[in-house]
Amino acid sequence: ALGVARRFAARTAIPTRVVALPRNVGGAGGFTAGIALAVEPLMQPLGPHTLGAGYRMGGYEPQPGLVHDMWLMDDDTVPLPNALEELLRASDACVAQNGRVPVALGSKAIWTDGREHLMNKPRPRTHPAEGGTKLRGLPSAYQTRSLSFVSCLLNADTIAAMRRLPKTAYFLWNDDYEYTTALLKRHIGYYVPASEVVHKTKVFGSSDADPGARFYNEVRNKIWLWRGSRGNFTRTERVLFLLKTVRRWALTWLRSPDRTVIADCLRRGWHD
């Protein structure tokens, strides 16, 4: 994969920097490193004179004007030609309608046969943040409470100001959920189905499809999220998170062809 990336960098006219990490830190570590490198040029020393017009009581709010965005994708994601264009179009629509730059925008993920990858489709936000629930001119887009890193446009200015990165220790799974729920607790984000990417997973399935031994990461990280990131959610959201997690784990257990593996993952994930 590193060789492919370097060959692409050598051939493309797009300025490209290939970064090789010294060890395997999983998807969570890779996204964290990428985000950190992207926001580094925007970082300023903390102080009363460096906060800028984007800061207000209760947090940082990105302002319309010069905007720095970063586009995150999984290594098995292939964007369709207009995927980025549609995300930027949604960003412009959000600014025009709400007077605010969206903190995060997510693409619609489809599988190799054209079916929508429902495991990457977020639910509409129950209690929308300030601004429109939907975007004028983009009727399929809607506000959401979380987004997937399969294809996600993040506002780099907000992240630099918040000094908040994903949690590398998650290694695999739920790092995007933990991070985007933190970003979107007080900020606006939209799911933009007009932006499409192909997510080339080995099998087509929902979030409760049998994950095998990787279910350990699901259990451990969800427990870590419950214990260490409860501030990401309101009280009602915490209750819903717990109920949905129990339901998902129960469906995973019922649908698994090897429940001994699932049971072992539950035991180890619970204790770790």
Question: What kind of feature is each model-predicted range?
Answer:
Residues 21-62:
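Glycine-rich, basic loop-to-helix element that forms the pyrophosphate-binding segment
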Residues 147, 151-163, 169-195:
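A short, conserved alpha-helix in the catalytic core of glycosyltransferases
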Residues 123-145:
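Short, flexible, basic/aromatic active-site loop/helix in glycosyltransferases
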